[in-house]
């Protein structure tokens, strides 16, 4: 019995450490999904840096107790898979896209730092651009005036050189 208890404590400790680093948790109900489908989802999740696992709900409740995600405990009923990630948009996006392709995988709820989200909120979060996309758009917006100014400064000597080349070609 103690070995079994130690194994259970290890699972709760592992999930608790992931929850401590997390910015978002998405829980989904999976009824009748095949192993191959789950394997594809696990691979996608791992590539995106998402901790994805199927565990007993009592273990998950203990892992989120006394954390900003403790409000999810009421939604932890039935056969659930847990996606835990440091990027809320990526976590929601990976699981939402998988749910669109598989009708037996249904997003049930989610949470971000004290905010419990419904399945519709998770879907809305999933359609947002990722952090990298937003940063690249911001950087492009910030660089545009500078780049335009540099091109304008460069145009004066370029016009002069083109004028000299035209005079040279004329002679």
Swiss-Prot record:
GO molecular function: large ribosomal subunit rRNA binding
rRNA-binding recorded as keyword: yes
GO biological process: translation
Keywords: Ribonucleoprotein, Ribosomal protein, RNA-binding, rRNA-binding
Key word Cytoplasm present: no
Function of the molecule: Forms part of the ribosomal stalk, playing a central role in the interaction of the ribosome with GTP-bound translation factors.
Protein's recorded name: Large ribosomal subunit protein uL10
Organism: Nitrosomonas europaea (strain ATCC 19718 / CIP 103999 / KCTC 2705 / NBRC 14298)
């Amino acid at each position: 019995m103690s070995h079994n208890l130690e194994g259970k404590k290890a699972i709760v400790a592992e999930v608790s450490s992931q929850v401590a680093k997390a910015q978002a948790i998405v829980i989904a109900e999976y009824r009748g999904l095949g192993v191959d489908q789950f394997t594809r989802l696990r691979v996608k999740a791992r590539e995106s840096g998402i901790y994805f696992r199927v565990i007993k709900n009592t273990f998950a409740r203990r892992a989120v107790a006394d954390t900003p995600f403790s409000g999810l405990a009421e939604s932890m009923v039935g056969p659930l898979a847990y996606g835990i990630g440091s990027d809320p948009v990526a976590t929601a996006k990976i699981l939402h896209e998988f749910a669109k392709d598989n009708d037996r995988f249904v997003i049930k709820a989610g949470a971000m730092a004290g905010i419990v989200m419904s399945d519709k909120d998770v879907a809305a979060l999933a359609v947002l651009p990722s952090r990298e996309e937003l940063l690249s758009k911001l950087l492009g917006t910030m660089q545009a005036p500078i780049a335009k100014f540099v091109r304008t400064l460069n145009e004066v000597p370029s016009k002069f050189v083109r004028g000299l080349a035209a005079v040279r070609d004329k002679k």
